[in-house]
Amino acid sequence: MPHDPLRSERLEALLADCQNEWEQLAALETYLEDQLEFPLRAVCDVPPEHGSYGIGEGDRVTILGFLEPDKRWGIMVRVRKGQRVYRCPLFRLKPWKSAGAQQIAVDDYRTWFNAVGLPEIVDPEE
């Protein structure tokens, strides 16, 4: 991810009133909803996690829209690869040949997710 000297200022302003990671995720989701226009071309530049199907590193996809956030993977998007449609965590995707504002917004989210992320969910029944 290219260094953006204003990224920390943007994230600080966006997240200033948030009390925890879940509130930060909600604030970032609102920010992304304002910045992104679908469909949006992207490339996957993060290897898949165990149990992740369909989208591999280097795959080019079209982001079709947002899905409900996931407690482990954060903001989820619906993507098309060829004729198939998949769910994919947004942090695995980088906009490709898109407007600068869209690239900046996704890079802001990816920076936050990789630095802060979401707390691990502990299942009380385990």
Regions picked out by a protein language model, each given a short descriptive name:
Residues 1-104, 115-125:
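Basic/aromatic-rich interaction segments and small domains that mediate binding to polyanionic partners
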